[in-house]
Amino acid sequence: MIAMPVLGSSAAEIDKILGQSTPPFGVVFEIVENDRAFLNRAVLEVTKYIQQLRQKFPQLHIALVSHGKEQFALMTKQQQKQSTLHKKVRSLIQDEHVTLHVCGTHASWYGIAPEEFPDFVDVAAAGPAQINDYVKLGYTLIRIRK
């Protein structure tokens, strides 16, 4: 088990990074809530943080890992109902070069296969393990909470 840093608010963590003269290797945003509707708000918050980070550190590596019920808003069958969210997420991936992962294990608990997500969504075997991998690489973990 990897010891995860204890973090304050996500805004305080962003301010801490912005106060540094050199960037971390990368930033990984973690979203995990038991609320299917939360991803819309979380993506808006993450987008704001990415803009702030990229203004100071244009080449910063950024990843986003969703591994709660909110990840189901990214399923292919939700593309029409959640079209604004899907467009925002695609823009983060294409325009901001953000790597996005959802949790295959969590999805499997609800009988959802990786193929039920669109191609722009990477279905990781396990969201927490994906986050641990980023932290091992030197990414700073920022948790997005309600």
Question: Which residues are covered by each model-predicted region?
Answer:
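A cross-taxonomic marker for long C-terminal extensions/tails that follow the last structured domain
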Residues: 75-146
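Acidic helix-start/capping segments at beta-turn-to-alpha-helix junctions
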Residues: 60-74
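Structural recognition of the beta-strand scaffold that forms the well-ordered cores
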Residues: 27-30, 63-66, 99-102, 143
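Envelope-exposed proteins and targeting segments
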Residues: 25-27, 58-60, 96, 119
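Surface-exposed patches in mature extracellular/periplasmic domains of secreted proteins
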Residues: 53-64, 102-105
